[in-house]
């Protein structure tokens, strides 16, 4: 039996307001793959005390995690920019949406 491993990379969902549209063009491929694994480049948490116009950022609103609906797992070892609270909030959110994580 052949399985397909589909890799997505360097995903940053900062500023995402419509998570269901992010992977719309490749949704069938994601759904049909045996395993989908991606590199998550952001933490899912609400950052306090920042300028809303700021363009730098490796964080995204927790609601954006639903964009990963067709992902089985993500790597998140590089998400250390905002500290332990942000990392733990992100891991918790990934657990809530049913996406496995490593790193």
Q: Language-model features: where?
A:
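Acidic, metal/ion-coordinating pockets
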Residues: 1-103
